[in-house]
A protein has these predicted regions:
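A short, conserved structural fragment
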Residues: 13-20
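Short amphipathic alpha-helical interaction segments
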Residues: 1-11
Length: 172
């Protein structure tokens, strides 16, 4: 396609710009947000509010997709207009720690497991909404699928052992 063709499709409302060089058909059912995220960020792992909602530790559907990505990746790569995203830049060796797979809208995704998600929540608790934080902790404590040895291993690697013992140890 030539630029003039793309411009015409944009002006007529058939396509929408995601970022430079990336567009999607507005009417297409294959342009779900998660498909776009998987395409643009195949190395990213869903985390924080997105993972909390996935595991039903939060009843609030996140306004933006949260994912962890290698901190050495260019910031320009995450500068997109749609969908709304929040990239957590972390150490390269920690990106795959606690990674598992799941399905969102029939699309396979990389997502952190329950235990890693709670460690991330504890690490970022000062930046989180208090209600979401409290529900996440209560949801995890009451979850029969929690894995305490994994939680403690992740807590050690992510340096949140003290918070885990203070905030979750009381409930276990």
């Amino acid at each position: 396609l030539y630029y003039a063709d793309i411009k015409q499709l944009l002006d007529e409302g058939y396509i929408e710009r995601i970022r430079r060089g990336y567009y999607h058909w507005i009417e297409s059912c294959e342009t779900r947000e998660i498909v776009i995220i998987n395409t643009l960020f195949p190395d990213a792992v869903l985390c924080m509010e997105t993972a909390l909602f996935y595991y039903k530790y939060s009843d609030r559907n996140p306004a933006e997709w949260s994912f962890a990505i290698d901190r050495n990746v260019s910031k320009l790569r995450t500068n997109i207009e749609y969908p709304f995203i929040k990239a957590y830049r972390i150490e390269p060796e920690l990106v795959t720690l606690g990674e598992t797979t799941g399905k969102i809208d029939f699309t396979k995704v990389r997502i952190y497991d329950r235990d890693r998600t709670i460690c991330d929540v504890l690490k970022n608790m000062s930046k989180m909404d208090k209600e979401i934080f409290n529900k996440a902790i209560q949801g995890y404590v009451n979850d029969p699928k929690k894995n305490i040895p994994n939680l403690m291993m992740y807590a050690k690697k992510l340096r949140v052992q003290k918070k885990v013992k203070e905030l979750i140890g009381v409930w276990l």
